[in-house]
Amino acid sequence: RVTEQMKNEADTEYYGVISIGTPPESFKVIFDTGSSNLWVSSSHCSAQACSNHNKFKPRQSSTYVETGKTVDLTYGTGGMRGILGQDTVSVGGGSDPNQELGESQTEPGPFQAAAPFDGILGLAYPSIAAAGAVPVFDNMGSQSLVEKDLFSFYLSGGGANGSEVMLGGVDNSHYTGSIHWIPVTAEKYWQVALDGITVNGQTAACEGCQAIVDTGTSKIVAPVSALANIMKDIGASENQGEMMGNCASVQSLPDITFTINGVKQPLPPSAYIEGDQAFCTSGLGSSGVPSNTSELWIFGDVFLRNYYTIYDRTNNKVGFAPAA
């Protein structure tokens, strides 16, 4: 098993350091269960977004192999276009030879320029990997670098350090109680069925919908009308897609309870309201997708900080246990 420590960037992003090439160069990457490709900024990129980051220099690596393929990725808040190469990648002490990785030529969108990380390491299923690239975890598995075909996340709160992702194992010190296992409904993202969402015992949204468990998204993302219902139920107002609560009365706000695979998972206001007394926003945002198309939720870090999560590829299940 391989353990990678992650830095908590203001409770919005979690990234760890990997190395690529020979001799190894270090890069900060987000370990993202919502995508499947590995990519980093590279010397091919002259865009402003790349200038603030470590750039991978393939010509300086003796183990680099060209593939002749290109890769194009889009994310909720940005993207990356570039070429696909192959090199040795080291994660948490485990060395992964012949790993396919994207090298950015352009990184459109303002998001990447200010980002504290140099790239993204995707941990979703190979079926959604762009350019047919083999994801890092699959490649490590095929080379027997991990004991078990699962990985797990602990995300710290309050800006604290100590966050980790364990590839090939489970860290029992990071959770209490029992693990609640949920079947994956589509082997693309880590997608699960959500039975319903209640506030004060009443259904607020989603009578049977789908959710993606996504460590690379900071908020809980909801369809527009579902978010409006929940805001009404907890007495919050909206401002440009950000939900405002009455900060002084956070303690008196109700839990938002998500029922997943028959088990109630309550989210207390201390978890979904962020900020201080003067100004606060909720950790829920809108996907901009009307609910009548397909009611898809994203469980981002606001939700995941409350749980130790285990992603089991052998049995295609996600495990949730209360974080310790």
Swiss-Prot record:
It is an enzyme of class 3 (hydrolase). GO terms for biological process: digestion; proteolysis. Residues 86-109 are annotated as: Disordered. It comes from the Eukaryota. The active site is at residues 32, 214. The lineage of its organism: Eukaryota, Metazoa, Chordata, Craniata, Vertebrata. Coiled coil: none annotated. The keyword Hydrolase applies. This is Pepsin-2B. InterPro entries: Aspartic_peptidase_A1 (IPR001461), Aspartic_peptidase_AS (IPR001969), PEPTIDASE_A1 (IPR033121), Peptidase_aspartic_dom_sf (IPR021109). Disulfide bonds join 45-50, 206-209, 247-280. Its EC number is 3.4.23.-. Residues 14-321 form the Peptidase A1 domain. Belongs to the peptidase A1 family. GO terms for molecular function: aspartic-type endopeptidase activity. Residues 96-107 have a biased composition (Polar residues). Keywords: Aspartyl protease, Digestion, Disulfide bond, Hydrolase, Protease.
